[in-house]
Amino acid sequence: MKTGVFVFDVMTKQPISVYKDKNLADCANLMEKKDVNSLIIKNENNKVLGIVADEDFIRKAIAKNVDPFKTKVEEIMATEVITIEPDKDLYDAVKLMGDYNIRQLPVVENHKLVGIITVKDIIKVEPAIFEILSGKIRLKTGDKPDLIY
């Protein structure tokens, strides 16, 4: 079920990212300031090393009572990062998000970070896809009972 909309049409082209040695307090402040739910961790060559989401701060930092000023983001980031290429169909991004239960995908081209696509980005352009992501696909009743929306 391709949409005809590509990842590069929807993605945020300048994602918020940090280097792995940034402390958790600085990362949390940056996320608050930029109003984002995740940060991409990259190296000097713009290669994605990991990702940290707001729930990582809760499960891996707050719950374990770590010092946010002494703990580096590399200590709590997810290193097995699911990514997508900018020329993929939006449906492919939605499928990956659903399959891996994630809310964001770093967009990479030639192993370099070029953007990020989030559930919020997708909902802005294709609100109906939200129902797919949230697992609430329902059979529409009426004249055409086989129509899914």
Tell where the protein language model's regions lie, with residue ranges.
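Tandem CBS (Bateman) regulatory domains
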Residues: 1-14, 53-98, 118-149
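Short, flexible active-site loop motifs that bind/organize anionic cofactors or intermediates
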Residues: 14-17, 47-48, 83, 112
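The conserved cystathionine-beta-synthase
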Residues: 17-35, 42, 84-101, 108, ...
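A glycine-centered beta-loop-beta connector
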Residues: 31-34, 39-56, 97, 105-120
